[in-house]
């Protein structure tokens, strides 16, 4: 499917991210199972929305994490199947774009608000051997090097 791109956009602000994140998962699973895409970029907003609205210490935030974990589990299962059935190598990367204040929101320059993480998990291949401290501007090059 070279030179073909598919973009799925759902309006979480209108319909809520519980619904939209699930629809994004369904579309991503379909893409992985049926379209054979080499790269999928999937964005779930439910955790970010819960952090803004309720802070990171409440039940709403934990529930949002559990929902996104279930979505990621579905994607992981599809990638495991592809690796097993087709001998494919996949790299599942999870990243946040920022942290939150305990009481909710972000936008400041505190260490807590600037905190982020990257998790890279090899499927049908080894995990990448990246440094524990990755500067945000280095991530693109690390990802591209994995395709070499």
Residue positions per predicted region:
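Feature captures the catalytic ectodomains and active-site-proximal regions of enzymes
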Residues: 1-148
């Amino acid at each position: 499917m070279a030179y073909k791109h598919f973009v799925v956009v759902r309006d979480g602000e209108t319909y809520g991210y519980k619904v939209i994140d699930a629809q994004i998962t369904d579309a991503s699973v379909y893409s992985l199972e049926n379209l054979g895409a080499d790269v999928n970029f999937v964005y779930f907003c439910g955790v970010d929305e819960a952090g803004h609205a309720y802070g990171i210490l409440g039940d709403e935030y934990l529930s949002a994490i559990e929902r996104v974990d279930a979505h990621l589990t579905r994607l992981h299962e599809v990638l495991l199947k592809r690796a097993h059935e087709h001998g494919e190598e996949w790299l599942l990367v999870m990243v946040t774009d920022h942290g939150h204040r305990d009481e909710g929101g972000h936008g400041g320059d505190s260490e807590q608000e600037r905190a982020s993480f990257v998790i890279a998990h090899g499927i049908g291949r080894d995990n990448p051997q990246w440094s524990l401290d990755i500067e945000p501007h280095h991530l693109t090059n690390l990802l591209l090097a994995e395709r070499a």
